[in-house]
Amino acid sequence: LYYEIHITTLIKQSSHHLEIPERIGAWIGRAGLKDEALKQTHYDKDYKHYTFGSPFPREKEGVYKQGRVYVITIHSSVELTLRRISAALQALQEDEYFQFIAASPVQSKKLTHITELTTVTPAIVTIEGKPWVPDLSVELLLQRIHANAEKKYNHLYPDQPVRLEQPFVEGIQVLNHKPIALAYKGRKLLGNKLRLLVREDEYSQKLASVVLGSGAAEKNSILGAGFCIAKGLE
């Protein structure tokens, strides 16, 4: 089970598609400072359990245009987190890049059986402080994505910790020829779009569901990295 909202926004300054994730993350983060619970997670440096996709409709030239209206989808593993984000964005209304227009009600989403996950935004995995790139071991990438998902699950459900003998993903495909560079704090963070084939057992399914809500790998709430869509049975 995961949750979803759609935020309709007017873009106040044109933004390149590799720069806009940082700007969206900063807008949501700034709004979150108006909410005590969201503010606390900001200072705790813990998993925030939400992530967001690229604004829709996509722009073919790769630049989101000033004065146009777009929709941003936000996922979370925690329903209340989305309610708080929605209220906080309405309270903040705008920053230098975005003007809030509307928020949809929070919807709960459930797939009874997830067969695969695709990261629509690049997933960011760092190994010893450096980004995973396609020259490195795919096995290592798989292990890191699994370990991250397991930590998120155990953070959400500390009373029912899970440790799997094998990764929840049985196959992985890198969908880009070269890494994608997202702007972050004046530098670039490299990520990759991935297709993850999910195992059928109960715990693998639980981890896949957490990845749908909280995002795959790192920088989910700050850059919308690892925002996933799923294939499976409703």
Model region roles, listed by residue range:
Residues L1-E234:
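RNA-interacting cores
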